[in-house]
Amino acid sequence: MDYESIKKHAKAVSEQVLTVRRTIHSRPELSFEEHETADYIAAQLTEAGILFRRIAGTGILARIEGHGDLQRCVVLRADTDALPIWEETGLECASRHDGVMHACGHDMHTACLLGALLVLNRHKSEIAGTVFGLFQ
């Protein structure tokens, strides 16, 4: 896995990551209520051919298997919940849910984790072990 190849693939998914962030930002959900968010993430993972399973109601555990000892693993994690705050930014992607807002960056954490998984999935033959992505 060389830097230039990773950089190229990251650039290739950058618009998708921005779209994911804006979509999630506009549809915030409080802790343990992130059903729409989980469905959206699941659809993105399915489209990319990344294996995953739903866990704990609104969580998702994605899995990218490389080669060699698959017991060797790393877990990348992102929060998916929003806060009970009114958004008054006037942004095009502002919250559509009254009194709930992604005010602490969890929408970006989620989008970046998805982006990382998209890039790593393209390089899975070069990964010695397993990469998990936990959307929580």
Regions found by a protein language model. Give the residues of each.
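Divalent metal-dependent hydrolysis catalytic cores, especially in the metallo-beta-lactamase
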Residues: 130-136
